[in-house]
Amino acid sequence: MPINPLYLFPNLFTASSIFLGMMSIFYASSYQFVMACWLVVASLILDGLDGRVARLTNTTSKFGIEFDSLADVVAFGVAPSLITYFYVGYNFGRIGMAVSALFVIFGAIRLARFNISTNTSDPYSFIGIPIPAAAVLVVLCVLLDNKYHFLEGNTEKLFLGFIVLLGVLMVSNIRYPNFKKVKWNLKLFILVLIFLSLVFVRPLEALSVFMGLYLIYGIIRWIFLMVKIIFNKNKSA
């Protein structure tokens, strides 16, 4: 059965994401953490392109969806997990191993849940923080420490705790914005230009602030919703 060459095009982006994820693992295993971390960020860019290319070329397929999920496990599950272990996790023996493994497991659960709920969930939000966002938050912490050296002593334990938190957030019911479905307008276009300018000037700091706000947004929104539900229950009681 002949295959339309156009179907290969978006999958090349997905395959490239896996390749960069593997390169990230290799660099991390040789303690070249800066390169390893930026490769995960580069994988995020490719991950955002494959779906768009598939939609633009009208080559969306079930194979592409499953292939993308497998790529995400490698690039955003295994790669940041091993970066975490080689960077600080090994100092804590089996605890470090367990934390690194749990991140991959929770990420795989997150992807499986996403695949079976794609047609029923709100297209403008994700249930649980997306695994690419969690992965980028991990590598940004490593890059920030490489530059500012804040992970020492007890803060290494906090970093492992942060990894566990990200894993829990991935399988939680906390909703996060889906920027792939955002509606473009002039105001948003200007904001994106400002953000890209900041990324050009201070890439690490700008990305860290943006991703930090993204992380906190979901948690604060969830807290407000819980407070509202409790208040309404007490009011109706």
Swiss-Prot record:
A Pfam cross-reference name: CDP-OH_P_transf
Domain of life according to the entry: Bacteria
PROSITE patterns (UniProt xref): CDP_ALCOHOL_P_TRANSF
Example of a GO biological process term: phospholipid biosynthetic process
Subcellular location: Cell membrane
EC number in record: 2.7.8.8
Any one annotated GO CC term: plasma membrane
UniProt enzyme class: transferase
MF terms (GO), sorted A to Z: CDP-diacylglycerol-serine O-phosphatidyltransferase activity
Keywords tagged on the record: Cell membrane, Lipid biosynthesis, Lipid metabolism, Membrane, Phospholipid biosynthesis, Phospholipid metabolism, Transferase, Transmembrane, Transmembrane helix
Membrane topology: Multi-pass membrane protein
Reactions listed under catalytic activity: a CDP-1,2-diacyl-sn-glycerol + L-serine = a 1,2-diacyl-sn-glycero-3-phospho-L-serine + CMP + H(+)
Family stated for the protein in its record: Belongs to the CDP-alcohol phosphatidyltransferase class-I family.
Protein name: CDP-diacylglycerol--serine O-phosphatidyltransferase
